[in-house]
């Protein structure tokens, strides 16, 4: 078979040339497509999970000792090792999407701390300012100023049925397919206990620079308000704070506060509301002394 090649007339190319082009294109595209698929896969997985806090057990134990040995020595008899084991037993080796309130009951029963009457400060969408305020008004307690809130603040944790270890890498995000995560159930349980143990006049710091300062969907609006005991709590004071230089989207005259007032009054608890409660405004103004809404205070 003479091996002669036709010189290609303009336009039609020999098959081998085309197959080479195809191979080159495939050679280039396939890895790109594969990389894209892997990247999307990782992204979706990342979206369904979030980083668990590294060394949660060590952090919880350390915070417990710091809190009970030098911040609140009156609690020095609390057994921090037992608190840690009781905390982790609530979620290790369990389905991280089906943790129950009962799982945390042994921890709630173990840690006994009473907040003095008239010293409970709730917050909603104003965590930083509430903590700055209670950091100055040291007799006031947010949940994170109590032992259980302090040991877990800003941590993420979960377990896994396949291991008795506390997960170090990723934990499932709380969403419709995974509604009862170890972290979210913990905050619901300790928020409920924090509200149940409140007495006298209690306070809530709300954010009037958000569309609705009060939301029934929030932990404060769905758990804490409904676990205040009217025979122990006679008054709720709301402070609607606005960001310095921020927009005033809601206030004590707003519809969301009217809703809060009616819920609280229906529970036979008196309700008062102040916009930009002055002492908390002072705390905000420490960081913005030049702002006109602060210079008037000086
Ligand atoms: C703290 C966390 C975390 O009154 C406050 C506190 O007592 C708190 O437990 O619940 C109230 C705030 O929750 P709310 O009203 O839903 O306000 P938010 O600004 O939307 O806060 C959402 C987070 C509340 C529960 N929570 N609290 N430290 O690390 C933490 N993680 C979660 N999920």
Swiss-Prot record:
Pfam families: Rib_hydrolayse
BP term (GO), one: intracellular signal transduction
Glycan-carrying positions: 98, 118, 177, 207, 268
Transmembrane segments: 22-42
Positions annotated as active site in the UniProt record: 117, 199
Catalytic activity: NAD(+) = cyclic ADP-beta-D-ribose + nicotinamide + H(+); 2'-phospho-cyclic ADP-ribose + nicotinate = nicotinate-adenine dinucleotide phosphate; NAD(+) + H2O = ADP-D-ribose + nicotinamide + H(+); nicotinate + NADP(+) = nicotinate-adenine dinucleotide phosphate + nicotinamide
Cytoplasmic topological domain: 1-21
Localization terms from the record: Cell membrane; Microsome membrane; Endoplasmic reticulum membrane
Topology in the lipid bilayer: Single-pass type II membrane protein
Annotated disulfide bonds: 64-80, 97-178, 158-171, 252-273, 285-294
Molecular function as annotated in GO: NAD+ nucleosidase activity, cyclic ADP-ribose generating; phosphorus-oxygen lyase activity; transferase activity
Domain of life, per lineage: Eukaryota
Alphabetically ordered keywords of this record: Cell membrane, Disulfide bond, Endoplasmic reticulum, Glycoprotein, Hydrolase, Membrane, Microsome, NAD, NADP, Signal-anchor, Transferase, Transmembrane, Transmembrane helix
Side Extracellular, residues: 43-298
Family membership: Belongs to the ADP-ribosyl cyclase family.
Subunit record text: Homodimer.
PANTHER family tied to this protein: ADP-RIBOSYL CYCLASE (PTHR10912), ADP-RIBOSYL CYCLASE_CYCLIC ADP-RIBOSE HYDROLASE 1 (PTHR10912:SF5)
Function (record text): Synthesizes cyclic ADP-ribose (cADPR), a second messenger for glucose-induced insulin secretion. Synthesizes the Ca(2+) mobilizer nicotinate-adenine dinucleotide phosphate, NAADP(+), from 2'-phospho-cADPR and nicotinic acid, as well as from NADP(+) and nicotinic acid. Also has cADPR hydrolase activity.
Name of protein: ADP-ribosyl cyclase/cyclic ADP-ribose hydrolase 1
Native source organism of the sequence: Oryctolagus cuniculus (Rabbit)
């Amino acid at each position: 078979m003479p091996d002669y090649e036709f010189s290609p007339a303009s336009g039609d190319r020999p098959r081998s040339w085309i197959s080479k082009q195809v191979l080159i294109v495939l050679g280039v595209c396939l890895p790109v497509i594969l990389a894209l698929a892997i990247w999307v896969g990782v992204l979706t997985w990342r979206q369904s999970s979030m980083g668990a806090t590294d060394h949660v057990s060590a952090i919880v134990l350390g915070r417990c000792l710091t809190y009970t040995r030098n911040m609140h020595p009156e609690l020095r008899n609390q057994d921090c090792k037992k608190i840690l084991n009781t905390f982790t037993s609530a979620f290790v080796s369990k389905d991280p999407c089906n943790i129950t309130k009962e799982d945390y009951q042994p921890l709630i029963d173990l840690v006994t701390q009473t907040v003095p009457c008239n010293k409970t400060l709730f917050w909603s969408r104003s965590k930083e300012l509430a903590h700055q305020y209670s950091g100055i008004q040291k007799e006031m307690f947010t949940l994170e100023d109590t032992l259980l809130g302090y040991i877990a603040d800003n941590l993420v944790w979960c377990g896994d049925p396949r291991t008795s270890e506390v997960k170090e890498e990723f934990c499932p995000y709380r969403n419709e397919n995974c509604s009862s995560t170890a972290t979210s159930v913990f905050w619901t349980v300790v928020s409920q206990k924090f509200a149940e143990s409140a007495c006298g006049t209690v306070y809530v710091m709300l954010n009037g620079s958000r569309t609705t300062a009060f939301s029934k969907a929030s932990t404060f609006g769905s758990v804490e308000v409904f676990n205040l005991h009217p025979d122990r709590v006679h008054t709720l004071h709301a402070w609607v704070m606005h960001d310095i230089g921020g927009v005033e989207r809601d206030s004590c005259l707003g519809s969301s506060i009217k809703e809060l007032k009616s819920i609280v009054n229906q529970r036979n608890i008196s309700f008062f509301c102040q916009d930009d409660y002055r002492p908390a405004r002072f705390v905000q103004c420490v960081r913005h002394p030049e702002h006109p809404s602060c210079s008037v205070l000086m």
